């Protein structure tokens, strides 16, 4: 295999291109013109011709794209999603893609700003592995100094709701509240300011999708509100 495809070339798709281009020729399709001569931009139909196709569109657009692909993709292909939630895209792919299409569910726990850092982690699940390409991709990502955590979509979303979901929710709440740096900032306050900077760098749509497409975040937010109320009542006594 010497060529792969990426469908979706937003901020994360561009990062994925940087990661994959170290080992492969990469064809890219995006619904908007890319206008970068260093990117091999191809048509939607040509993007579906390669053996492995990475899907890097926003979560809210994922189902529509997979349904569109379902009657166009040839047997023997492998689709790899990189969504920040996993139960939803896993079900969409299993329900709509032909049985002779392999499926790998991944979540790179890093972004364009942290890819170069050591300690990058990616979750992976082999959803359908007729053609035994799962190990190939696991080995490739490990060769790029990425630690692979093999967990199910359900386990991923349960943990992510109380880690990623919580982090982004708190970051947005603090950003709405307002953070102004002062000359007497404590290390704890600086950490809060850094949290806001990290979480609010992503598009608002990603924040909404992380909250709305993870089946476990509603419970997390309810419990967080309960804890906020509990602590407030304690200090008011």
Residues of each region from the PLM?
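Rossmann-fold dinucleotide-binding core
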Residues: 85-147
């Amino acid at each position: 295999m010497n060529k792969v495809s990426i469908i979706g070339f937003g901020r994360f798709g561009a990062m994925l291109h940087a990661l994959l281009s170290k080992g492969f020729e990469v064809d890219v399709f995006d619904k908007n013109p890319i206008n970068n001569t260093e990117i091999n931009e191809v048509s939607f139909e040509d993007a579906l011709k390669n053996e492995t196709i990475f899907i890097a569109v926003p979560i809210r657009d994922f189902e529509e794209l997979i349904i569109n692909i379902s009657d166009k993709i040839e047997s023997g292909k492998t689709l790899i999603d990189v969504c920040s939630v996993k139960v939803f895209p896993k079900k969409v792919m299993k329900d709509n893609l032909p049985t002779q299409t392999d499926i790998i569910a991944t979540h790179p726990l890093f972004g364009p700003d942290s890819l170069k850092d050591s300690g990058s982690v990616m979750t992976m699940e082999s959803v359908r592995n007729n053609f035994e390409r799962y190990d190939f991709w696991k080995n490739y990502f490990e060769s790029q100094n990425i630690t692979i955590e093999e967990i199910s979509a359900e386990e991923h979303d349960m943990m992510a709701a109380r880690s990623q979901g919580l982090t982004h929710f708190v970051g947005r709440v603090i950003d709405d509240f307002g953070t102004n740096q002062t000359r007497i900032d404590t290390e704890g306050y600086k950490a809060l300011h850094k949290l806001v900077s990290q979480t609010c760098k992503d598009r608002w749509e990603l924040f909404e999708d992380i909250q709305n497409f993870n089946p476990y975040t509603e419970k997390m937010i309810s419990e967080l509100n309960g804890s906020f109320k509990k602590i407030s009542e304690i200090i008011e006594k």
